[in-house]
Amino acid sequence: MHRHRLSTLASGVLFFFLVLPLAALRADTSSGAPPDQLGRVNFPTSCTAEVQPTIEKAVALLHSFQYTESKKTFADASTHDPKCAIAHWGKAMALFYQLWEFPNDKTLKAGRKEIEAAQKLRPATPREQGFITAAAAFFQKKSKMTHVDRLQAYSAALERLYRENPGDVEFGSFYALSLVSLAEEDHDNEIADRQKAIATLEPLLQQHPDHPGVAHYMIHATDRPEFAAQGLEAARRYAAIAPDSAHALHMPAHIFVRLGLWQDSIASNIAANASGAHAAEMHLAESHYQTHAMDFLSYSYLQSGQEAKAREVIEHANHVVGASEEMKAGDRAYLAARTAVELHHWKEAAALPVAASREDWQSTVVWARAIGAARGGDLAGAESGVKELAQLVADREKRSKKSGYAGSGEKATDLREAEAWLAFAKGKSDEALQELRAAADHQDKNGGESVSVPAREMLADMLLELKRPSEAIAEYRTVLKNSPNRFDGLLGAARSAQATGDARGAQSYYAQLAQVCGAGADRPELAEAKTYLAQK
């Protein structure tokens, strides 16, 4: 997709926002900064001087999860210096999508082949040997090893290297990333692993303010409600460190969304989407860099009261560069489903087309349809939706288990939510509240998804509908603690405070909602806030 084909999203005022963030985030190249704006990486090797800049560019790309381009760049180094062992290590690492997906047997075999090639070249320095040995621990040929086993072996090797080389920014940053990878899968030790990663990265962030991996991994390490504030400095830096990376332009939004900084998130993701589209045009990146940014962009528009802009993002899914028609339809269906539920447009949610979505997002669409039907009073439609969702969840969990992902042992949150609203529609309020409370507690324990409707907010909504505002406002307060500045959290808290006779509390929440949304907001509920504030 060329920028002139972005339809309404790239016209008029929005064109300003698409183009300027990229220019504004680029560092001044006259000061001696590298020509590729990917951050400063010093990665000494025994390879020839000719390929050393290529190696460092490839490592910088690796730190920003630009895996396709990183692999190509390492391969280029290997072509120009066939004895460069670390280039083979790099090609293996570019196959290891640590936070995105588990490598299958084919990928493990390909990675192991590269590591064996690196070992045969007998790298000259202990540092190179260390990186290659650590990667070998992950790619080792043991079919019975689980993914977590491989991560633990890899992380343990990096921990030893970092202890032997304290302050080494490359060993330290890769070690911290391995801890975040473990935290994503080893739920019993998640908090401890994240805390260790943060403790490793904090001093490195001060010592190496332009290093892409340190800032990037700090954002991932702190991507939970209780840690998000610790990641704000890294979030503010990362896009400026590596403005030529679409992922670097997007990643700050993980923290901005956690902290309810909607305008920051919007600017971040508009820039990331434009950069991702350009990279896809050049065949340097896959389409998901665009769609992931659009996911966060849509959510941020909704939370800042900009319904029309959120709907433009749905339409923009038709123009994602490099995506198949099936992928475009699936992404569009997913965004439409979340939008309908966020806006409480129950008829719209219940009428969402299912066939248009691809398998990955099918359960989200059916979840929205089931809740929409239940809240719209269509019991038959809700029951059918819940039944279909239960099957989709079972299939999803089978695929997940087959791929090596560890299950939580808990009923899926989306299924609990749909079942709860069905029970509520049937008049079984105690059962409904019990289901939502269990879903909310599970979500809170695991950090919750940053761009989804919190189950606890649904619980608060249900309590308010049951005319139990004192209980509802307690739940809304918890929602706003974990997900600050959520539109419906603030609106629900204001309504609950008003229902309990707390005029000062209602005024405070309505005022906060009006401030968060600003002049460009168009959600009709804002009229309620303005009317209340005008009366006071």
Give each language-model segment a name.
Residues 47-76, 132, 136-144, 368, ...:
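Alpha-helical segment of the N-proximal tetratricopeptide repeat
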Residues 48-49, 82, 87-89, 124-125, ...:
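Residue signature of alpha-solenoid helical repeat architecture, marking inter-repeat boundaries
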Residues 54, 88, 95, 130, ...:
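TPR repeat positional signature
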Residues 79-80, 162-164, 205-207, 236-244, ...:
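Solenoid-like repeat scaffolds
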Residues 85, 92, 96, 104-123, ...:
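TPR/TPR-like (Sel1-like) alpha-helical repeat modules
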